[in-house]
Amino acid sequence: MSGRGAGGFPLPPLSPGGGAVAAALGAPPPPAGPGMLPGPALRGPGPAGGVGGPGAAAFRPMGPAGPAAQYQRPGMSPGNRMPMAGLQVGPPAGSPFGAAAPLRPGMPPTMMDPFRKRLLVPQAQPPMPAQRRGLKRRKMADKVLPQRIRELVPESQAYMDLLAFERKLDQTIARKRMEIQEAIKKPLTQKRKLRIYISNTFSPSKAEGDSAGTAGTPGGTPAGDKVASWELRVEGKLLDDPSKQKRKFSSFFKSLVIELDKELYGPDNHLVEWHRMPTTQETDGFQVKRPGDLNVKCTLLLMLDHQPPQYKLDPRLARLLGVHTQTRAAIMQALWLYIKHNQLQDGHEREYINCNRYFRQIFSCGRLRFSEIPMKLAGLLQHPDPIVINHVISVDPNDQKKTACYDIDVEVDDPLKAQMSNFLASTTNQQEIASLDVKIHETIESINQLKTQRDFMLSFSTDPQDFIQEWLRSQRRDLKIITDVIGNPEEERRAAFYHQPWAQEAVGRHIFAKVQQRRQELEQVLGIRLT
């Protein structure tokens, strides 16, 4: 451990006979040599008055308070002494990481200006790289180029024109998207032709073992003979169907009833019915097989499966509105148009409708509310009429016309509806647009940075001296903001501010810290430990 003089400067190792080391270690000091201070003067006033304590070297105040401190350098005669007068120097009063130590003797207890204290704000953890990138993208500037850049680069006007066109295009696409969303909510159908094929085959009776296939005798058949029977097929398909996926025939109907001749098959076996159930599997056709060798008259009742459901109006209301079979929403719309056209809405109480003579006959009242119309209308709606087809099942082998074709109108989903749904559900274009927007934002940000660098260099080349001074003032302001040091510029510009007691102590601390730093550097270079 090196010796330390009264001024606080670290000293090289003294000779074995020196008394500074002993005084620093708390040993009894050697007799004072010529020109040296007496031994008791090296001891501090103790815990009550100084920074030193038992076993620690004391520091005497210098300057007007006492004689100038002197220390002896190695290799110098005792008579050659170097006085150290002026500022107080020495180690800081206590460890910077420990409790505050009392002030050195002769110094009034002053406190540091609270405005110069650094506020310790808890530092938040830095965001992750992915979060930082996302935050940066959210805080990016708009895609519009600043006016200064547009004035500097006239060619950038083409980019601004494209940006204006893109804005109009985005508005148009957004409006069309909303229109598509509204259109999908409504039933979007188109009428197509469904061709129904009704055919039948006849299997004559055969005797068992008859390989020639001749018919049995009219008088009767043996016990092992095969009974004559016929089979009816009902199939169909859409005409000019552009879709690749063919729709099943049964999916067009809600129910199918085949009514056979009641006189031939009796009251219990003359009806063949099929009704759609939640668990029904779609099929391409229907087959009915019955025994018999006579021509049979049959009636086919086909009930279409309308989506949304359609209803048949009361004949009186149908003639009045001009609507026979339609959806509930279409019927309500036609009814409102009739009320509006004939001015049946009450002029004062707008929720009431004044019935004319036709409405009085249909609704059996002279006045009704709007809210009562759905309830009144429910009793006037019926299920739509089924499609009726009369067909004769022929068992004559010479009859070549055993297949009949019937065309009916059906409503199918418009292919455009599927394209609309795919357009709304597709996110490929949105992802591509978002990626391009990110690139545009990054490019604009890079352009702004380059513009800032250009202005920096241009200002420096125009007037280097004023630029450097202004830049230093800016850096000083930024440094105060970064280090959280808030000072008073008006006080700091005056010399009296730096003659306060805290300034002398701060200088001593600073010099001591610098000496310690240089000492550590010297030890590292020499590879030794100075003791």
Swiss-Prot record:
Q: Which residues carry this modification: Asymmetric dimethylarginine?
A: 81, 104
Q: Write the signal peptide boundaries.
A: none
Q: Does the keyword Glycoprotein apply?
A: no
Q: Where do the segments described as Disordered lie?
A: 205-226
Q: Which InterPro entries match?
A: SMARCD2_SWIB_dom, SWIB_domain, SWIB_MDM2_dom_sf, SWIB_MDM2_domain
**Can you say where in the cell this protein is located?**
Nucleus
Q: Where is it mostly found?
A: nucleus
Q: Which GO terms describe its molecular function?
A: transcription coactivator activity; transcription coregulator activity
Q: What are the entry keywords? A: Chromatin regulator, Isopeptide bond, Methylation, Nucleus, Phosphoprotein, Transcription, Transcription regulation, Ubl conjugation
Which tissues is it found in, per the record?
A: Isoform 2 is expressed in the pancreas.
**KW Transcription (keyword) present:** yes
Q: How is it modified after translation?
A: Ubiquitinated through a signaling process involving RAC1 and the RING finger protein UNKL.
In-chain residues carrying the UniProt-annotated modification Phosphothreonine: 217
Q: Residues involved in crosslink (Glycyl lysine isopeptide (Lys-Gly) (interchain with G-Cter in SUMO2))?
A: 226
Q: Specify the superkingdom.
A: Eukaryota
Gene Ontology CC: bBAF complex; brahma complex; chromatin; kinetochore; nuclear matrix; nucleoplasm; nucleus; protein-containing complex
Clinical note on disease? Specific granule deficiency 2: A form of specific granule deficiency, an autosomal recessive disorder characterized by recurrent pyogenic infections, defective neutrophil chemotaxis and bactericidal activity, and lack of neutrophil secondary granule proteins. SGD2 is due to defective neutrophil development. Bone marrow findings include hypercellularity, abnormal megakaryocytes, and features of progressive myelofibrosis with blasts. Some patients may have additional findings, including delayed development, mild dysmorphic features, and distal skeletal anomalies.
Q: Which family does it belong to?
A: Belongs to the SMARCD family.
Per UniProt, subunit arrangement is: Component of the multiprotein chromatin-remodeling complexes SWI/SNF: SWI/SNF-A (BAF), SWI/SNF-B (PBAF) and related complexes. The canonical complex contains a catalytic subunit (either SMARCA4/BRG1/BAF190A or SMARCA2/BRM/BAF190B), and at least SMARCE1, ACTL6A/BAF53, SMARCC1/BAF155, SMARCC2/BAF170, and SMARCB1/SNF5/BAF47. Other subunits specific to each of the complexes may also be present permitting several possible combinations developmentally and tissue specific.
Q: What does this protein do?
A: Involved in transcriptional activation and repression of select genes by chromatin remodeling (alteration of DNA-nucleosome topology). Component of SWI/SNF chromatin remodeling complexes that carry out key enzymatic activities, changing chromatin structure by altering DNA-histone contacts within a nucleosome in an ATP-dependent manner. Critical regulator of myeloid differentiation, controlling granulocytopoiesis and the expression of genes involved in neutrophil granule formation.
Could you identify this protein by its name?
SWI/SNF-related matrix-associated actin-dependent regulator of chromatin subfamily D member 2
- In which organism is this protein found? Homo sapiens (Human)
Underlying gene: SMARCD2
